[in-house]
């Protein structure tokens, strides 16, 4: 990854895809191998159900993305770039995660190459993020997103943890919790009003003169990007759709 050498990874990925196809042939020979694998993540979902939804999204999103790119109005987000000390980023993320309800006596937050949430039990839930010195918002919103997953995990049944009733219902339900917090809550005017003082206290040189409205516009800027987890609310679905079509 650090050397950007996909050629080293490609043979392993090829083998994995071949094994997933073989697995599907043994486990669910009555359906396509892709439908069998979809069912692992979203029970009952099939290409026949998903494709029309994605086609509908594409018909609306592609013109919208084009209109945004061609718009004369471009919100100022320059103050979101700078030099943000990593320990301050960590403290800010932890504070907001706690405010959301994540119980650190039943979980922890660490650093990883790619943000994720995991753990073996509702009393041991692990969330991770990654830090960039020049962009604190990437880490903060990763923390918020993964805390959404973590809250779902910490809310699962403690009794009968090995039984189906204690399992996460589906990937879609799980992702609905993380994206609800990240998009609906953390990109809202109310969130920006509530947390601008804390952000300004953490990074005064950048945010002392910034209004909540400016912050709200900056965290909602929409522009195409190569990285799914860094994508905005408008372009994010296109990352998912593109992967689906490639697969």
Residue positions per predicted region:
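Secondary-structure capping and boundary motifs in well-ordered enzyme cores
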Residues: 12, 85, 119-123, 132-140, ...
